[in-house]
């Protein structure tokens, strides 16, 4: 039986309703020469086996992260994800579930969201966390908007160590909200004067640690300076594993902590989906964007979980909403929660220690290569080196040898005089042989 979605009578009635004589009239804004009159000459359909082989040939052109020594970071990190994480999140109760608007049938989802919030608050040293954002960049953008609401001021200062993609999200939002954004020049060694830029118009100071170049920052002096000026300090991170070893931003005085949670429980995923983390102090709770899961008692006095304080535009008047983000990264935050639960506090610290040790070992080896200059003094699992010549050329040459060497800074900051800089990350997945291969290949490439 054929499926006929539209009869001639249906078409005539619809055209009459919208007031046009023909279907072609609906497309009159498109130049006639640009319209597709006949179907293109596409190849005939293929069987499943043929399609799989064709796609396999295409994918074989890529140098996969799993098939080569991989030192790429700059905001997305390759970590080992236990098989149990993927197995559990693929259960249909999690994989296919929708927003838990009906708590009486969604206690499982609500409970893991509550546990996720608890873990994020503990990791960041804050008092409350939301149910996640799209990713670290959108969390940063929402944090800046939250700071504007809280302080009634309209200027944000972005550190020169903030990931350029995060800065682009903030400036894109500011173009529509009318707020001012001051983006500091690239700060390769975390030595910029941020305190001197604070004034009575500043709502927030946004500082990343570890920053995009790998530098670790002491946030306490910045937090003290911000308090004196009535400015909110927003601490950003892109590598969540660092929180297993580095002092929590909240414990250093940050007012809002945001970042990317991809490196716990989530694979690289071609750049997404990821999971944005957002935490703050209890006194700012009502201006925190996104969803919040709370614990309560039901009519029979039993412990239960519900969505609470959802001041999104779906729930209240748009002009009163704290955010127009319409969802959270539910499955990704479940993966985060499962992995972190499996690790535990000691496991996370051990994982972070291994990451740091691998990075220090690699940095020491590379610093001994003639022509290589290490720019960082303190770092976690990522650092920046200066090379003779264009870093992009060296990366391409090493990729041809089967080594993914890192991210040229010129890709993140084109035209900023950073052509000779390379960001390198080393995590627990990089073996001693991997690190030795990178050092040897780069030394030969430079010689």
Curated annotation (Swiss-Prot):
One Gene Ontology term from the biological process aspect of the record: nucleoside metabolic process
InterPro entries in the record: GcvPA, GDC-P_N, PyrdxlP-dep_Trfase, PyrdxlP-dep_Trfase_major, PyrdxlP-dep_Trfase_small
Catalytic activity: N(6)-[(R)-lipoyl]-L-lysyl-[glycine-cleavage complex H protein] + glycine + H(+) = N(6)-[(R)-S(8)-aminomethyldihydrolipoyl]-L-lysyl-[glycine-cleavage complex H protein] + CO2
The keyword Oxidoreductase appears for this protein: yes
Gene3D superfamilies: Aspartate Aminotransferase, domain 1, Type I PLP-dependent aspartate aminotransferase-like (Major domain)
Segments passing through the bilayer: none
Keywords tagged on the record: Oxidoreductase
Superkingdom: Bacteria
Claim: Transferase is one of the keywords in the record: no
Pfam families (alphabetical): GDC-P
EC numbers for this chain: 1.4.4.2
GO molecular function, one term: glycine dehydrogenase (decarboxylating) activity
Family, similarity comment: Belongs to the GcvP family. N-terminal subunit subfamily.
The protein's assembly and partners: The glycine cleavage system is composed of four proteins: P, T, L and H. In this organism, the P 'protein' is a heterodimer of two subunits.
Function: The glycine cleavage system catalyzes the degradation of glycine. The P protein binds the alpha-amino group of glycine through its pyridoxal phosphate cofactor; CO(2) is released and the remaining methylamine moiety is then transferred to the lipoamide cofactor of the H protein.
UniProt cross-references to NCBIfam families, sorted A to Z: PRK00451.1
Protein's recorded name: Probable glycine dehydrogenase (decarboxylating) subunit 1
Organism: Beijerinckia indica subsp. indica (strain ATCC 9039 / DSM 1715 / NCIMB 8712)
Lineage: Bacteria, Pseudomonadati, Pseudomonadota, Alphaproteobacteria, Hyphomicrobiales
